[in-house]
Amino acid sequence: MGLESILVDEISKECDKLIKRYHDYHNHIHLEYLRDSKRLNKVKDKYLKEPDYWTTNKGCNPFYVKKNINVIAHSISKKITEKNYKPFSPSIFEIPKENGLPRKIVVYPIADNVVSKLFYKRLLKKNKHRFSSYAYAYRNDRNVHFAIEDISIDLNRNSRSFVAEFDFSDFFGNISHDYLRKQFDRNGFKISDEEQYIIDAFLSNEGDKGIPQGTSISLFLANLACWELDHELEKEGLNFARYADDTLIWSTNYQKICNSFNMINEFSRAAEIPINTEKSEGISLLKQPEYKKSEFSEKGTKTNVDFLGYSIFIDKISFREKMITKIKKEISYIIYKNLIQPLKNNNFKKYTEITKGKDYNLMVAIMQIKRYIYGGLNNQQIVNYITGRSNRLMFKGLMSFYPLVNDVNQLKSLDGWLVSSLHRAIKLRAKLLINNNYIISGKYAFPLDKANLVISLNTNKGNKYRRNYEIPSFMLIHKALEVGIKKEGLSKIMRLDTPEYDY
């Protein structure tokens, strides 16, 4: 198959993916509108957004590109053959990060993205065996979860280890082109003249430093740039995990961990990427909480390290604290939106059914929480998988992004918080319903004391929708994930669309 035919096929697939994503968004908005229409007197009009860059850059609009696919593919194929191909300028916009600072988002035209992806796959196929086994980013044989699992297993072998944590300032934006190009002919990498030409075409938009974000070829370049650093760390006999520019290094030998500091500095100087001293933790002693004394000061010791969205202890893996805050915020909003807000705004439909064992709004709230935590599964399906009554489960939702979290106390605490949050909201809901004359005192659908409320929601005999009222459990889905990992392996049960960025 010639290049033009390949481009037509791949651009078509990319357009179909983006069009489906937009239609899914459209359907989600419509379903939300229908749900709100059932429970609210006043419903906001449906408002569908399109990305601004679809208008300012037609090459990013999948509907336009799909319609003109043959012309676009022919033009690009001809330009590559004649060596005058250059990607169009990307659309660049900013979104706020959690710390309030802006995060730059780069979106290349669809066809240029496809070119980048084709050459990235070709380069990776030929060269992935050259990359360190401790480099986990942007590869089809490794991923973020493998990194976390390997780190946890190795740290668990010792009651204490020295760890080095460093953060680079804008790794993708600062890396020197001179340093990068020197790597093309070093260290056994196979890069053809055509592939080098395509790389140069994408680098030409970046001046004399930086690699293009938002395009696949930069993923190969990021690993290529770090090859010598990886090699030096391996030669020193250090344990490490690198995901793009995020690197965690550990050892039981203090001298070796100090040597890693010099290696990081040397790489920073050679590649012209400054170290972010404010965000870099430097060298610390990682130890069990019960080990009170050490040769390090209290500031130089820690019981866990945060890496790629997880918090890793010597004997367990947890959610990071900021993730716990995010989880609670999301669930609290679902509860408030469904159970409290309509009553406070006097926007509650009187004929919404509230009878013994039935409260439509409560059912919707619990179903949405369940979908958030573990997708469209119900508790019985998960129990059947754990006990072996069913052989396969499609894991979705929050926990499928964090399959390695095994901090039982943290998960039990989340379960307790969820029950308490529901209980408080239901008590307030019953009070508001009584005050607004929707129901009479003592006639709410479920018991208002916590113990009986939980039993009633989780059993709810006689209600054909009883599965929809069952309270979801972080511990329950954790047990199912453990079974899945043992039975099928980590790569089979994790989300295929696990984010590659923003850890």
Kindly give the residue locations of the regions a language model identified.
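Conserved polymerase palm-domain catalytic core
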Residues: 133, 148-290, 299-304
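Conserved two-metal-ion catalytic palm core of "right-hand" nucleic acid polymerases
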Residues: 1-183, 189-191, 203-205, 414-503
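Short secondary-structure boundary segments
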Residues: 60, 111-139, 208-224, 230, ...
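Conserved phosphate/pyrophosphate-binding and hydrolysis machinery centered on Walker-type P-loop NTPases
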Residues: 66, 141, 215, 219, ...
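Glycine- and acidic
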Residues: 58, 100-105, 132-134, 165-166, ...
